[in-house]
């Protein structure tokens, strides 16, 4: 009898590093997690220590093996998924970062982005990278490090510095500096990668003064990039065989590998991705065009829309409004009333994301009458998550011409049955909640497992994407459209608040 083998997924997130071990049936055998420090040097700036990221990630790997009593020679391969856009620059001779990692949330490069717009590069960037000009992406962060760290520019020109997103840094460290690589999904979030040619965009690198020698080699999301030694020299050599950015890994973990398949991750915000296959769709409706994973981990195209306030609006009800003691109670109170009684909550606390991209919109409650109580406001807040999701899905359908047949969902808020049913009603499609909540780790594990032959193909994996529950739409069309029109009016109110201020 052959000894049982396992796949490890390393899930390097914004607040914690996790390691997840899966068996051949894609069951989770063991999980280990460690949080790390969030550094805020100035208002709007966010950093991490790259050495702490690596230390927490490597220790969770050792911990989770020990916890499950699994030896390192039983690991068939390692898959990596990571927070996207976060930028690390290090010296390849010393292995030391020249500065902290600049995190995706960091807004310090807003001025550089304005200059790119003034230089008339907005359309070129959208057409060739699929992205909007924003501090969110890596390109302007690399430039900031080279411009502001003493000696960095000279070392970069001399070929001594390397750039990487978090996946690249982890692989470089795990292979003792032998492998400098990223995958298409992470490269597509840098704002300097051309998604038409699948090469680094030399025009944009030149514009930002970034030497090409710093950039990692870009490969597919499912192949053996190198090996790591667990247990030091003479230890077990394990192939690192899968890499994908967190949202693309979740899309793959949900088995959305064909054109028109879509998923929504309900976290602090909501991340919607729709696979558009080999067809690159340039959005005219405020979405990003990005790279995802095709059936074998090869590059395929996707549309992405981010909603800023998903689960965060429930936290607001709990922490600021004190309407809930526990976020889980929101479902109970929302179902105590039959409707929201004409109330709409637009949680534009930090502006509105896709498809509006309105930084000046502000949170708004409209439609209040004397009969409205706290339960109506709780219900309307939950409903806002579903309405914002529909805003993005409508934009995706308009851009791609593809009609959504069903939506696969994951993330913390999917445990709320009221929200999932309302989501199905608002979209008029079935909503499928997966049984495994760890879909991001699952995606990374699948990509690695396919590359090393742990799983033979997609047919084998499709059986593992088990649905916990499907929610079917109930509303009649007139009621659905009437409610959604009300939401659109409420959004206009949230947007006009700043406009009215300008008129004063």
UniProtKB/Swiss-Prot annotation:
**Family matches, as InterPro entries:** ATPase_NBD (IPR043129), Carb_kinase_FGGY (IPR000577), Carb_kinase_FGGY_CS (IPR018483), FGGY_C (IPR018485), FGGY_N (IPR018484), Glycerol_kin (IPR005999)
Task: Give GO BP annotations, semicolon-separated.
Answer: glycerol catabolic process; glycerol metabolic process; glycerol-3-phosphate metabolic process
To which pathway does this protein belong? Polyol metabolism; glycerol degradation via glycerol kinase pathway; sn-glycerol 3-phosphate from glycerol: step 1/1
Binding annotation for ADP:
14, 18, 268, 311, 412, 416
Q: What's the EC number here?
A: 2.7.1.30
Superkingdom of source: Bacteria
A Gene Ontology molecular function term of the record: ATP binding
Q: Which GO terms describe its cellular component?
A: cytosol
Q: Which UniProt keywords apply?
A: ATP-binding, Glycerol metabolism, Kinase, Nucleotide-binding, Transferase
Gene3D superfamilies registered for this protein in UniProt? 3.30.420.40
The entry's sn-glycerol 3-phosphate-binding residues are: 14, 84-85, 136, 246
Q: List the disulfide bonds.
A: none
Positions with a binding annotation for glycerol: 84-85, 136, 246-247
Top-level enzyme category: transferase
Q: Where does ATP bind?
A: 14-16, 268, 311, 315, 412
- Classification via CDD domains: ASKHA_NBD_FGGY_GK (cd07769)
Q: Give the reaction(s) catalysed.
A: glycerol + ATP = sn-glycerol 3-phosphate + ADP + H(+)
Q: How is its activity regulated?
A: Inhibited by fructose 1,6-bisphosphate (FBP).
PROSITE patterns from the UniProt entry: FGGY_KINASES_1, FGGY_KINASES_2
Family membership: Belongs to the FGGY kinase family.
- Protein's job: Key enzyme in the regulation of glycerol uptake and metabolism. Catalyzes the phosphorylation of glycerol to yield sn-glycerol 3-phosphate.
Q: What is this protein called?
A: Glycerol kinase
